[in-house]
Swiss-Prot record:
GO molecular function: DNA binding; DNA polymerase processivity factor activity
Function: Plays an essential role in viral DNA replication by acting as the polymerase accessory subunit. Associates with the viral polymerase to increase its processivity and forms high-affinity direct interactions with DNA. Facilitates the origin-binding protein UL9 loading onto DNA thus increasing its ability to assemble into a functional complex capable of unwinding duplex DNA.
Composition bias, Low complexity: 331-344, 368-379, 437-453
Name assigned to this protein: DNA polymerase processivity factor
DNA-binding keyword on record: yes
């Protein structure tokens, strides 16, 4: 599952005869990306809520599309643009990476800012040269008062390829995912802690209730499996009976849909940047994706709509309680204390402080007492000493830019768990096997870009000549579906 050096993405048939009047790509340019018409309007709509958040980003370009990678408040943000979203997308050669910022003022992505060019008509990216010393030239056209297309030569930007780069692309299938509408996600964000001293608990109880709470605030929803008929949903019936003064619309507002909602868990998130990141990105509705059985557990929030931006928040393994592992699917042996303390009936969207206390102290999820009460505490091993590296660039001898390490996983905060040493996580595909039940299941293999593991590391090191498969090989299918950035 590697990129084909000579692979060419099929061009979209939306080109028209006006291309000739708008200029041709540079002679011998092996790669060309064109935006105009409906495709240009779609990209402008996708960037509209992002404002200036992604102006200083890393652009990873390959035969599958463009991946925009950035860091906001220390958290990883990804925005994929598939080749079908462009009017023309032609690519030959290995994957390339470019820093979007040109001169500390202008960016390759500035053209997509709202009202930057009111009469914008066409955007073209042409990449010439030989890897890893290729050059990207961005040209734009606007429409004059006479309806003619004119190129703005003064706005032409040029950028050299990064001779070396590293980017971590999450991948894999989430253990549990829940889809929230814009009002529902807003309530969840309002319930999250604003500082590290106020941890937030995400909990999916055995009674089918999804709760997000702190010591002072709580919001709850009925979690329903995607595609289940409303006539067979007990939780919907409970909600309909409880809301005597409301109609079906009110019941739907308190119901979230997702996949694997039978997998009960409790997760304590002490990262205070979640609310700030999602508000900066202006995420409306979104999907919460919980990756809890991997060596590096995380929570991913993917926005719905045209932009499909994803933010990844890393979790502490010792603050994760998985109740469904070790039991048959859909029949966890014990629910969490928060679900049992609050009863089986979902509460209203915003509860009082006293009701939130009845859910239990989130810190209780971290101790041995909680492990004994829940029946099983399955925590993933702590990641090895990994640190977040700030992207740095320097000029190479050949004139190309060099970014040694663009990003890496952040190191968890200090602190020792009070629970017993965690056991090896049980893979989902072997959770009912006899070997897994006996605790002899093998540890998952180390992350590999081609094995469908949690993280794939893509790189090119110019001095050594080492290189990984293209950065989009993770989205080509294989044993696991993509991480959820919008690619099929």
């Amino acid at each position: 599952m590697t990129d084909s050096p000579g692979g060419v993405a099929p061009a979209s048939p939306v080109e028209d005869a006006s291309d000739a009047s708008l200029g041709q790509p540079e002679e011998g340019a092996p790669c060309q990306v064109v935006l105009q018409g409906a495709e240009l309007n779609g990209i402008l709509q996708a960037f509209a809520p992002l404002r200036t958040s992604l102006l200083d980003s890393l652009l990873v370009m390959g035969d599958r599309g463009i991946l925009i990678h950035n860091t906001i408040f220390g958290e990883q943000v990804f925005l994929p643009l598939e080749h079908s979203q462009f009017s023309r997308y032609r690519w030959r050669g290995p994957t390339a990476a470019f820093l979007s910022l040109v001169d500390q003022k202008r960016s390759l992505l500035s053209v997509f800012r709202a009202n930057q060019y009111p009469d914008l008509r066409r955007v073209e990216l042409a990449i010439t040269g030989q890897a890893p010393f290729r050059t990207l030239v961005q040209r734009i056209w606007t429409t004059t008062s006479d309806g003619e297309a004119v190129e703005l030569a003064s706005e032409t930007l040029m950028k050299r390829e990064l001779t070396s780069f590293v980017v971590l692309v999450p991948q894999g299938t989430p253990d549990v995912q829940l889809r929230l509408t814009r009002p529902q996600l807003t309530k969840v964000l309002n319930a999250t802690g604003a500082d590290s001293a106020t941890p937030t608990t995400f909990e999916l109880g055995v009674n089918g209730k999804f709760s997000v709470f702190t010591t002072s605030t709580c919001v709850t929803f009925a979690a329903r499996e995607e595609g289940v008929s409303s006539s067979t949903s007990t939780q919907v019936q409970i909600l309909s009976n409880a809301l005597t003064k409301a109609g079906q619309a009110a019941a739907n507002a308190k119901t979230v849909y997702g996949e694997n909602t039978h997998r009960t868990f409790s997760v304590v998130v002490d990262d205070c940047s979640m609310r700030a990141v999602l508000r900066r990105l202006q995420v409306g509705g979104g999907t919460l994706k919980f990756f809890l059985t991997t060596p590096v557990p995380s929570l991913c929030v993917t926005a719905t709509g045209p932009n499909a931006v994803s933010a990844v928040f890393l979790l502490k393994p010792q603050k994760i309680c998985l109740d469904w592992l070790g039991h048959s699917q859909g029949s966890p042996s014990a629910g969490s204390s928060a679900s049992r303390a609050s009863g089986s009936e979902p509460t209203d969207s915003q509860d009082s402080a006293s009701d939130a206390v009845s859910h239990g102290d989130p810190e209780d999820l971290d101790g041995a007492a909680r492990a004994g009460e829940a029946g099983a505490l399955h925590a993933c091993p702590m990641p090895s000493s990994t640190t977040r590296v700030t992207p740095t660039t320097k000029r190479g001898r050949s004139g190309g830019e060099d970014a040694r390490a663009d990003t890496a996983l952040k190191k968890p905060k200090t602190g020792s768990p009070t629970a017993p040493p965690p056991a090896d996580p049980v893979p989902l595909d072997t959770e009912d096997d006899s070997d897994a039940a006996d605790g002899t299941a093998a540890r998952p293999a180390a992350p590999d870009a081609r094995s469908g593991s949690r993280y794939a590391c893509y790189f090119r090191d110019l001095p050594t000549g080492e290189a990984s498969p293209g950065a989009f090989s993770a989205f080509r299918g294989g044993p696991q579906t993509p991480y959820g950035f919008g690619f099929p």
